[in-house]
């Protein structure tokens, strides 16, 4: 029996490419293979435009295939936000990324992973307290900056820097090990999905956290987020978008994103049977 319904499920790498994504995936994969780090790429497009499908293809090509050059870490931000306050969402995402990194490092350097985990625990304990102090209302209204709260004193600044330094050292040692073993692995690719399903002001806070904490050598972030979501998320801070303040919105986006990549495919091919 033939079926004729349309489902909203991202394309897997081994499914037929009805949207013509493959040529874009190949070009972007080649760019990523040769890119300097750190780097953040934004896959832009409306919800349902194929951002997750493209990320699936990139993950298979660059992380899961034979002799893939990157470790891959996938994080669905919307799932982390379920049944969580905005403050809890931010902490859960930082912890989620960090734990996934620790899992990779632990395979090669058990002692290094344990040492970094201790530093991470101290940071999470303090960060949870400081972010909770901000409160959901101020997070959503843009009245308080998360990174500012985490580095508003010498003690907090040292704690944040220690976390970043230990994370960078651990990743560098992992890549050095891979080079010595000639495995072909030379970095970590982070796939951050479904940011456009989160409340826009919270999504903007997540972007700032990623930039200030995880902007590291040997790391490339691929974000599924549209510029319109960033605009909505920045309205509490900058007001309605106008010709006069458009530069402020664009400057924030450009500060976070080095390569915007549009997923508005010019040709959509639907196979009819």
Language-model features: where?
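Conserved Walker B catalytic segment
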Residues: 155-232, 237
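Walker A/P-loop-proximal flanking segment of P-loop NTPase domains
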Residues: 1-83, 87-91, 170, 174, ...
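Short glycine-/polar-rich loops that comprise or flank the Walker A/P-loop
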Residues: 68-72, 186, 216-220, 225, ...
């Amino acid at each position: 029996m033939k079926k004729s319904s349309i489902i909203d499920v991202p394309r897997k790498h081994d499914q037929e490419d009805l949207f013509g994504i493959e040529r874009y995936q190949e070009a972007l994969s080649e760019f990523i293979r040769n890119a300097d780090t750190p780097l953040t790429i934004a896959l832009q497009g409306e919800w349902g435009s194929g951002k997750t499908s493209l990320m699936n293809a990139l993950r298979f090509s660059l992380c899961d295939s034979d002799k893939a050059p990157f470790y891959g870490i996938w994080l669905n931000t919307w799932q982390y936000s379920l049944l969580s306050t905005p403050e809890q969402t931010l902490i859960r995402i930082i912890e989620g990324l960090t734990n996934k990194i620790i899992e990779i490092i632990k395979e090669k350097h058990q002692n290094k992973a344990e040492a970094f985990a201790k530093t991470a625990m101290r940071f999470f304990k303090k960060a949870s307290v400081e972010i909770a102090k901000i409160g959901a209302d101020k997070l959503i209204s843009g009245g308080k900056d998360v990174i500012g709260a985490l580095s508003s004193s010498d003690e907090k600044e040292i704690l944040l820097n220690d976390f970043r330094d230990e994370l960078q050292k651990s990743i560098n040692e992992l890549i050095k090990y891979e080079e010595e073993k000639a495995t072909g692995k030379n970095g970590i690719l982070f796939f951050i999905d479904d940011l456009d399903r989160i409340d826009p002001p919270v999504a903007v806070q997540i972007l700032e956290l990623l930039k200030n904490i995880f902007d590291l050598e040997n790391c490339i972030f691929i974000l599924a987020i549209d510029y319109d979501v960033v605009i909505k998320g920045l309205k509490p801070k900058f007001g309605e978008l106008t010709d006069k303040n458009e530069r402020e919105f664009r400057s924030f986006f450009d500060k976070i994103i080095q390569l915007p990549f549009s997923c508005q495919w010019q040709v959509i091919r639907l196979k009819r049977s």
